[in-house]
Every structure is written in structure tokens, then in C-alpha cells.
Swiss-Prot record:
A GO molecular-function descriptor: structural constituent of ribosome
Family: Belongs to the universal ribosomal protein uS15 family.
Subunit structure comment from the entry: Part of the 30S ribosomal subunit. Forms a bridge to the 50S subunit in the 70S ribosome, contacting the 23S rRNA.
Example of a GO cellular component annotation carried by this entry: cytosolic small ribosomal subunit
Name assigned to this protein: Small ribosomal subunit protein uS15
Annotated organism of origin: Oceanobacillus iheyensis (strain DSM 14371 / CIP 107618 / JCM 11309 / KCTC 3954 / HTE831)
SMART domains, alphabetized: Ribosomal_S15 (SM01387)
Gene: rpsO
Pfam families: Ribosomal_S15 (PF00312)
Length: 89
């Protein structure tokens, strides 16, 4: 269900803006997207796991807020990230 630390480090190294970056919107959105994908797979198998479904909805909301922030701050970075992650926005 949760992503491993190794996978998280791979995502951070792929989406980081500068060398010591771990908290930029791009990194946060990419990590949340990976967690959302993982949780979606879990919920396909365990349809009645409503506690995890609530966590999924919270993650989706957090990602939506970060995407809105990034779009308002820098549209080109936003569009590049959407394209790279394959999100439908």
C-alpha cells in the first residue's frame, strides 16, 4: 500500500528542482501521485476498505491544492509536471 523509501528517493531524484530539494511542489505532487496510484491498486482488491478510501480522498485533495498552487505560481512548470505525470488536467 505505502511506497517504499527507495521508491520515494527515486521519485525525489527524478522531480527535484535543485540538488537538496525534497519539498518543492513538483516533488510533493509526484510522491502523492505515486501513493495515490498504489492505494488505488489496493482498493481495487479490497473494495470495502473505507478507512483507506478516506485516506485516498485526503491525498487527492492535497494533491489538487498543490497543483492549484503550482499553476498560480508558475504555469510552465505546472504544464511540464502534468505532462510528465500524465495527469488529466
Amino acid at each position: 500500500m505505502a511506497i517504499t523509501q527507495e521508491r520515494k528517493n527515486e521519485i525525489i531524484s527524478e522531480y527535484k528542482v535543485h540538488e537538496t530539494d525534497t519539498g518543492s511542489p513538483e516533488v510533493q505532487i509526484a510522491v502523492l501521485t505515486e501513493e495515490i496510484t498504489s492505494l488505488n491498486e489496493h482498493l481495487r482488491v479490497h473494495k470495502k476498505d473505507h478507512h483507506s478510501r478516506r485516506g485516498l480522498l485526503k491525498m487527492v485533495g492535497k494533491r489538487r491544492n498543490l497543483l492549484t498552487y503550482l499553476r498560480n505560481k508558475d504555469v510552465t512548470r505546472y504544464r511540464e509536471l502534468i505532462k510528465k505525470l500524465g495527469l488529466r488536467r
